[in-house]
């Protein structure tokens, strides 16, 4: 009787259109209920039975019910699922498989089966890649996934590496492929094998891609010759190896090992500027004036060079600081090191005055055992030898940026626009409240930005600097020349690491076209998009493996009285994040550990401060002592507590 009743259908339609709805993202809690977050200000409660239809992170449209003045959300339509492809641990019970996603807020096992064509016999504890196939809001009875790839066994000591690489869909191994002979590039190569080129790297480095040689000229000028490994002498554009390198975009450096962009035969041997071996190179010769400026007379050319010494950062630094027993192999090498130190001092002084110099932060190195166990974490400060190489490379990249801009008008450039124009008024107001006056338009210019950075660097603490970081834009990779505000330079194009960066290989080919007087094609924007995406994924992978190893390293310190100095790096509503000074681990201090009475505590992300009873007790950049309260291995998170 009611089946096709148009009035009833109309009534249903009316009710449906009058019912309030909201779109938002589901946030799960550990208690079974959840919230629909519509925006930063508004969220609705989702009761536990309704949470069974959704997953943390799902974007949904929900019906909003009001009962006794209490609002709650009933998820109705899935806009975008949080999980599509994911990694997790397999559970096997009575021959039935399920998988628990590796995510701090996803605790429930999802029923699953192996996809057709996946031959591995999955066992309890295995790690796998899975893809979601069913979702309750799509009309399915429940969640369901398919296992698309076996990652490794639960007991594998190298789980942190394999799981992280699978999560970000990154390669596990060096690419296959060989380059048997050098290409005929129609390039005249100068013979520089008699010159005393040296390489300075970590003692364990095999992929040496830069060698340096300095000559003193009259008029207190120094001539610096930078020779860079030449993989494009072996790899033709559009070849199989070139396409592999284009996809990988970078060598992926993870704690303990790297996954190279090029086959190891090339990166660690044929192209590597090994001591005592003749190698093709792309070379830049420049003159450094007495005040550290680079003269306009920049010369790029192809050459054959032979490194006369493979030097290690620590040895060179010790020798220059008159420590330790190491001595250069000959007076000629000693003379090179002294001249390189002069180059470094001149360039550093010039950049301090005319551009910007990053503050030295230590690198943290994981010392690993045979089974991936963390034996130690060593802070390696950036010493004089590191700075020699850094200043030489920055100078060479400035030269390439100028030459590519003036001769071609394009290349692969690293650009950084400084502050986001939409937020400079806010920035000026914030700085003014701390007694610093800046013009909102002035900081959008390179000189204005540099002036502000120098003023911030002169502050007694880094607190103000940390407050304005959120107004800064991100560095980008562009085919158009443009300023790099972060370095304080008008243009910056890297070409000094072609073994490990595809963009540098592209710039090599463009520089070679200039050397030969040939025309060149502008790199495609898709290539720079791929580079930016790979850079992001590689950084995330490095961070994820690091978090896992830090958790392993600090596990036996949990609940003990071991004290660690820690710098506060961020304040949020729930507490504050700190970085342990000695090893670089990031830990979280929950708000209740800061003060027991919640109403007397204000944690402000906006101000970067923690106030107790109206008084600022902690602020970002403060260094405090902490102990490790807990290490949660399943989420790789470290919980710390301030020492009273």
Curated annotation (Swiss-Prot):
Domain of life: Bacteria
Enzyme Commission (EC) number: 3.1.13.1
GO biological process: mRNA catabolic process
UniProt keyword list: Cytoplasm, Exonuclease, Hydrolase, Nuclease, RNA-binding
UniProt entry tagged with the keyword Nuclease: yes
GO MF annotations in UniProt: exoribonuclease II activity; RNA binding
Compartment list: Cytoplasm
SUPFAM superfamilies: Nucleic acid-binding proteins
Pfam families for this protein: OB_RNB (PF08206), RNB (PF00773), S1 (PF00575)
Xref: InterPro entries: CSD (IPR011129), NA-bd_OB-fold (IPR012340), RNase_B_OB_dom (IPR013223), RNase_II (IPR011804), RNase_II/R (IPR001900), RNase_II/R_CS (IPR022966), RNase_II/RNase_R (IPR004476), RNR_Ribonuclease (IPR050180)
An example Gene Ontology CC term for this record: cytosol
Domain S1 motif per the UniProt entry, residue ranges: 561-643
Domain named RNB: residues: 189-516
Annotated catalysed reactions: Exonucleolytic cleavage in the 3'- to 5'-direction to yield nucleoside 5'-phosphates
Enzyme class: hydrolase
Nuclease among keywords: yes
Gene3D superfamilies cross-referenced by the UniProt entry: 2.40.50.640, Nucleic acid-binding proteins
Role summary: Involved in mRNA degradation. Hydrolyzes single-stranded polyribonucleotides processively in the 3' to 5' direction.
PANTHER family the record matches: EXORIBONUCLEASE 2, RIBONUCLEASE
Family: Belongs to the RNR ribonuclease family. RNase II subfamily.
Protein name: Exoribonuclease 2
Organism the protein comes from: Cronobacter sakazakii (strain ATCC BAA-894) (Enterobacter sakazakii)
């Amino acid at each position: 009787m009611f089946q096709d009743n148009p009035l009833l259908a109309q009534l249903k339609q009316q009710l449906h259109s009058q019912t309030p709805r909201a779109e938002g993202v589901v946030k799960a809690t550990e208690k079974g209920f959840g919230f629909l977050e519509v925006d930063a200000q508004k969220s609705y409660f989702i009761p536990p039975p309704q949470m069974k239809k959704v997953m943390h992170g799902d974007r949904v449209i929900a019906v909003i019910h009001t009962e006794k003045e209490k609002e709650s959300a009933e998820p109705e339509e899935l806009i975008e699922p949080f999980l599509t492809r994911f990694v997790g641990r397999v559970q096997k019970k009575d021959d039935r498989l399920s998988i628990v996603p590796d995510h701090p807020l996803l605790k429930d096992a999802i029923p699953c089966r192996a996809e057709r064509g996946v031959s591995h016999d999955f066992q309890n504890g295995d790690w796998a890649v899975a893809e979601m196939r069913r979702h309750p809001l799509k009309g399915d009875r429940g969640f369901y996934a398919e296992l698309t790839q076996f990652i490794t066994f639960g007991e594998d000591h190298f789980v942190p590496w394999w799981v992280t690489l699978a999560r970000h869909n990154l390669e596990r191994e060096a690419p296959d492929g060989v380059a048997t002979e050098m290409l005929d590039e129609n390039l005249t190569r100068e013979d520089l094998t008699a010159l005393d080129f040296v390489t300075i790297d970590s003692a364990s480095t095999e992929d040496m891609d830069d060698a340096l040689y300095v000559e003193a000229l009259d008029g207190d000028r120094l001539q610096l010759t930078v020779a860079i490994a030449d993989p494009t002498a072996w790899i033709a554009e559009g070849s199989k190896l070139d396409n592999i390198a284009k996809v990988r975009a970078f060598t992926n450096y993870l704690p303990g090992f790297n996954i190279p962009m090029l086959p190891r035969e090339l990166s660690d041997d044929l192209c590597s500027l090994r001591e005592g071996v003749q190698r093709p190179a792309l070379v830049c010769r420049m003159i450094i004036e007495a005040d550290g400026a680079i003269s306009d007379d920049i010369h790029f050319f192809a050459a054959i060079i032979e490194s006369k010494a493979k030097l290690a950062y620590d040895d060179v630094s010790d020798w220059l600081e008159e420590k330790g027993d190491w001595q250069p192999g000959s007076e000629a090498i000693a003379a090179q090191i002294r001249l390189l130190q002069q180059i470094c001092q001149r360039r550093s002084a010039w950049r301090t005055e005319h551009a910007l110099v990053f503050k030295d932060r230590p690198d943290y190195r994981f010392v690993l055992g045979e089974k991936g166990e963390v034996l130690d974490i060593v802070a390696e400060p950036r010493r004089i030898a590191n700075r020699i190489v850094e200043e030489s490379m920055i100078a060479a990249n400035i030269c390439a940026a100028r030459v590519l801009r003036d001769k071609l008008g394009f290349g692969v450039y690293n650009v950084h626009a400084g502050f986001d124009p939409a937020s400079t008024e806010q920035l000026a107001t914030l700085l003014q409240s701390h007694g610093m006056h800046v013009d909102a338009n002035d900081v959008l210019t390179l000189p204005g930005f540099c002036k502000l950075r120098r003023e911030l660097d002169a502050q007694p603490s880094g607190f103000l600097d940390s407050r304005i970081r959120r107004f800064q834009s991100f560095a980008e990779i562009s085919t158009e020349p443009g300023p790099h505000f972060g370095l304080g330079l008008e243009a910056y194009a890297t070409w000094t690491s072609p073994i490990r960066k595809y963009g540098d290989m592209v710039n090599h080919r463009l520089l070679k076209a200039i050397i030969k007087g040939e025309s060149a094609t502008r790199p495609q924007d898709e290539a720079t998009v791929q580079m930016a995406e790979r850079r992001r994924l590689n950084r995330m992978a490095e961070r994820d493996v690091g978090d896992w190893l830090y958790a392993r390293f600090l596990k036996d310190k949990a609940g003990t009285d071991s004290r660690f100095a820690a710098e506060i790096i961020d304040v949020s509503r729930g507490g504050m994040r700190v970085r342990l000074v000695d090893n670089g681990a990031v830990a979280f201090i929950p708000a209740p550990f800061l003060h027991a009475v919640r109403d007397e505590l204000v944690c402000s992300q906006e101000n970067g401060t923690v106030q107790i009873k109206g008084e600022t007790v902690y602020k970002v950049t403060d260094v405090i002592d902490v102990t490790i309260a807990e290490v949660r291995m399943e989420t790789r998170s470290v919980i710390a507590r301030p020492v009273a």
